[in-house]
Protein backbone atom coordinates (compact mmCIF):
# COMPACT_ATOMS: atom_id res chain seq x y z
CA UNK A 1 0.00 0.00 0.00
CA UNK A 2 1.37 3.41 -0.92
CA UNK A 3 1.88 6.30 1.50
CA UNK A 4 -0.98 8.26 -0.07
CA UNK A 5 -3.36 5.34 0.35
CA UNK A 6 -2.34 4.95 4.02
CA UNK A 7 -2.82 8.68 4.63
CA UNK A 8 -6.26 8.63 3.04
CA UNK A 9 -7.23 5.58 5.06
CA UNK A 10 -6.09 7.25 8.30
CA UNK A 11 -7.98 10.43 7.46
CA UNK A 12 -11.15 8.47 6.63
CA UNK A 13 -10.82 6.43 9.83
CA UNK A 14 -10.48 9.65 11.83
CA UNK A 15 -13.52 11.18 10.15
CA UNK A 16 -15.66 8.09 10.77
CA UNK A 17 -14.52 7.87 14.42
CA UNK A 18 -15.17 11.58 14.97
CA UNK A 19 -18.62 11.38 13.40
CA UNK A 20 -19.47 8.35 15.54
CA UNK A 21 -18.37 10.12 18.71
CA UNK A 22 -20.40 13.20 17.76
CA UNK A 23 -23.52 11.10 17.15
CA UNK A 24 -23.09 9.35 20.50
CA UNK A 25 -22.74 12.73 22.22
CA UNK A 26 -25.89 14.03 20.55
CA UNK A 27 -27.81 10.90 21.56
CA UNK A 28 -26.64 11.22 25.17
CA UNK A 29 -27.61 14.91 25.25
CA UNK A 30 -31.07 14.17 23.85
CA UNK A 31 -31.63 11.42 26.41
CA UNK A 32 -30.54 13.65 29.28
CA UNK A 33 -32.73 16.54 28.17
CA UNK A 34 -35.77 14.63 26.96
CA UNK A 35 -36.71 13.57 30.48
CA UNK A 36 -36.33 16.51 32.79
CA UNK A 37 -36.39 15.70 36.48
CA UNK A 38 -39.16 17.24 38.56
CA UNK A 39 -37.89 18.61 41.88
CA UNK A 40 -40.14 18.47 44.93
CA UNK A 41 -39.24 20.00 48.28
CA UNK A 42 -40.55 18.33 51.42
CA UNK A 43 -40.01 19.75 54.91
CA UNK A 44 -40.17 17.54 57.99
CA UNK A 45 -40.92 19.04 61.37
CA UNK A 46 -42.24 17.57 64.56
CA UNK A 47 -45.32 15.50 63.74
CA UNK A 48 -45.79 16.52 60.09
CA UNK A 49 -44.41 16.58 56.55
CA UNK A 50 -45.16 19.62 54.38
CA UNK A 51 -46.59 18.90 51.89
CA UNK A 52 -48.03 15.58 53.03
CA UNK A 53 -49.92 14.75 49.83
CA UNK A 54 -48.07 14.87 46.50
CA UNK A 55 -49.28 13.93 43.02
CA UNK A 56 -46.83 12.12 40.73
CA UNK A 57 -47.03 10.64 37.24
CA UNK A 58 -46.00 7.14 36.22
CA UNK A 59 -42.60 7.23 34.52
CA UNK A 60 -41.82 10.81 35.57
CA UNK A 61 -38.38 11.07 37.20
CA UNK A 62 -38.55 12.92 40.52
CA UNK A 63 -35.90 14.39 42.78
CA UNK A 64 -37.16 14.77 46.34
CA UNK A 65 -35.31 17.46 48.29
CA UNK A 66 -36.16 16.69 51.89
CA UNK A 67 -35.12 18.73 54.92
CA UNK A 68 -35.85 18.74 58.64
CA UNK A 69 -36.44 21.83 60.74
CA UNK A 70 -36.13 20.49 64.26
CA UNK A 71 -35.06 16.91 64.82
CA UNK A 72 -33.44 13.92 63.12
CA UNK A 73 -36.55 12.54 61.46
CA UNK A 74 -36.73 9.48 59.27
CA UNK A 75 -38.17 9.32 55.76
CA UNK A 76 -39.45 5.91 54.77
CA UNK A 77 -41.40 4.77 51.69
CA UNK A 78 -41.88 1.09 52.58
CA UNK A 79 -43.33 0.00 49.22
CA UNK A 80 -40.27 1.34 47.37
CA UNK A 81 -37.60 0.36 49.90
CA UNK A 82 -36.57 4.01 50.28
CA UNK A 83 -35.24 5.12 53.66
CA UNK A 84 -33.18 8.09 54.86
CA UNK A 85 -32.34 10.04 58.00
CA UNK A 86 -33.20 13.74 57.77
CA UNK A 87 -30.65 15.83 59.65
CA UNK A 88 -31.71 19.39 60.60
CA UNK A 89 -30.05 21.98 58.38
CA UNK A 90 -29.21 19.52 55.59
CA UNK A 91 -31.13 18.70 52.41
CA UNK A 92 -31.40 14.99 51.66
CA UNK A 93 -31.84 14.26 47.93
CA UNK A 94 -33.77 11.14 46.92
CA UNK A 95 -34.35 10.15 43.29
CA UNK A 96 -37.30 8.03 42.27
CA UNK A 97 -39.41 7.22 39.23
CA UNK A 98 -42.87 5.74 39.93
CA UNK A 99 -43.60 2.69 37.78
CA UNK A 100 -47.28 2.10 38.52
CA UNK A 101 -50.38 4.00 39.54
CA UNK A 102 -51.68 4.02 43.08
CA UNK A 103 -50.95 5.36 46.52
CA UNK A 104 -47.50 5.23 48.10
CA UNK A 105 -47.34 6.06 51.78
CA UNK A 106 -44.33 7.72 53.41
CA UNK A 107 -43.68 8.16 57.11
CA UNK A 108 -41.22 9.22 59.77
CA UNK A 109 -39.62 6.15 61.33
CA UNK A 110 -37.52 7.93 63.98
CA UNK A 111 -39.53 8.41 67.17
CA UNK A 112 -39.94 12.18 67.64
CA UNK A 113 -42.51 12.50 70.42
CA UNK A 114 -46.04 11.67 71.55
CA UNK A 115 -47.71 12.40 68.18
CA UNK A 116 -45.02 10.64 66.13
CA UNK A 117 -47.56 8.23 64.59
CA UNK A 118 -49.27 11.22 62.94
CA UNK A 119 -46.16 12.04 60.90
CA UNK A 120 -46.92 10.53 57.50
CA UNK A 121 -47.97 11.42 53.98
CA UNK A 122 -48.66 9.96 50.58
CA UNK A 123 -47.72 10.08 46.95
CA UNK A 124 -50.70 9.68 44.61
CA UNK A 125 -49.33 8.24 41.38
CA UNK A 126 -51.45 8.90 38.28
CA UNK A 127 -51.17 7.59 34.73
Located regions from the model:
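Short, solvent-exposed loop/turn elements at domain surfaces
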Residues: 49-52, 72-76
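Solvent-exposed coil/turn segments that connect beta secondary-structure elements
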Residues: 45-47, 61, 67-71, 80, ...
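Beta-strand-rich interaction surfaces with strong enrichment in secreted/lumenal proteins
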Residues: 52-54, 81-85
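Surface-exposed loop/turn positions
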Residues: 53, 58-60, 90, 102
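C-terminal segment of N-terminal export signals and the immediately downstream linker at the start
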Residues: 27-57
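Extracellular/periplasmic metallocenter environments
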Residues: 22, 26, 88-127
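Soluble periplasmic/extracytoplasmic beta-strand elements of cell-envelope proteins
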Residues: 41-43, 63-65, 76, 107, ...
Amino acid sequence: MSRDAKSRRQVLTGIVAGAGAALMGIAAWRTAHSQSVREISIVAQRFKFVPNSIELKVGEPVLLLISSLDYIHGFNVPDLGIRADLVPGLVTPIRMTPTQTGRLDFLCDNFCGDSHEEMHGQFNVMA
